[in-house]
Amino acid sequence: MQRSLPTSSSRPRTPDFSASPRDLGAIPFNRPFATGREIEYMRQALAGLHIAGDGAFTRRCQEHLESLLGAPRVLLTTSCTDALEMAALLLRIRPGDEVIVPAFSFVSTANAFVLHGARPVFADIRSDTLNLDEDRVENLIGPRTKAIVVVHYAGIGCEMGRIGEIAAHHGLAVIEDNAHGLLGRWNGRPLGSFGRLATLSFHETKNFSCGEGGALVVNDGNLVERAEILREKGTDRAGFFRGEVDRYTWKDVGSSYLPSDLLAAFLLAQFEAADTIQHERRRVWNRYFEGLRQWSQYHGARLPAIPDQSDQPYHMFYLLLPSAEGQQGLIDHSGVSTSLR
């Protein structure tokens, strides 16, 4: 190896290849960021005696996201996985339906629909961005196809113009699994604002975190009322608290998808520090990119590809290695912690 991987110090460190990763003090796979106001806001939630779901901090987070994405409704959920499961319920996915999903993604992208009996139809990905290959989607559409699920991998936008055209032509819903892409844009438009529905993740590995959490972005106003009902155990409880009904009752299927307001309090502090968080992530991402440029050429590895239409949120930095053989040894010797084993 000609060059060591960058570290958080100002001067790159040359690793001792005779040492173990533990001796090297491996660069961690993820280091959650704290702004300093998370505990303060959680104390405020406790003092307000409302720590269940849909409290003041939940509403503030949702309003922030609605403004950011231009969505008629955003609902915080207990995870991005739960938000995807809500999307399947909202689209009334049933056994025998088919849903097109990228062949490269986290399991939740497909699992949320398989849970309701759907058959996942896997579309190959592009070799440059690792996103769903828009040129392969149309040939996968059949009489049972109900939706196309896109994943903006590493926060790099899919080709939403072409995918939207295909979906509209065939009368299909588009769902954006935007777990990686909050604050990302495609042709100047926010990721998460293209599909009828989109999902977000606030897991500890994401740019903005509350440990475990997510959100459902409802871009189709016709789905808002039912989304609220599904999220509240199938009841019209949300309407009751707005004074729209004199009592709340069981209206539909549903589950309990509300996160505690304590988690929303933590998350709001993260949103308020967005500029600081993004500045640091951009700095680190660019340092990796520049520091690994020569190294990648020497080892035949590929760095992330960012299309001109894409404004990325600096969520993830990845390497495409030429072969699986020896890759873990190479990574271990570099003193970098990964999720590969």
Model-predicted regions and their roles:
Residues 51-98, 112-116, 122-124, 189:
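Phosphate-binding glycine-rich loop
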Residues 89-178, 185:
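PLP-dependent aminotransferase-like
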Residues 176-210, 239-241, 246-251:
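Conserved active-site segment immediately N-terminal to the catalytic lysine
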Residues 1-51, 249-251:
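N-terminal "arm"/small-domain region of PLP-dependent enzymes with the aminotransferase-like
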Residues 17, 56-63, 68-74, 135, ...:
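PLP-dependent aminotransferase class I/II
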Residues 76, 101, 122, 216, ...:
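Conserved SAM-binding loop
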Residues 200-201, 214-220, 268:
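Short beta-strand-to-turn element immediately C-terminal to the catalytic PLP-Schiff-base lysine
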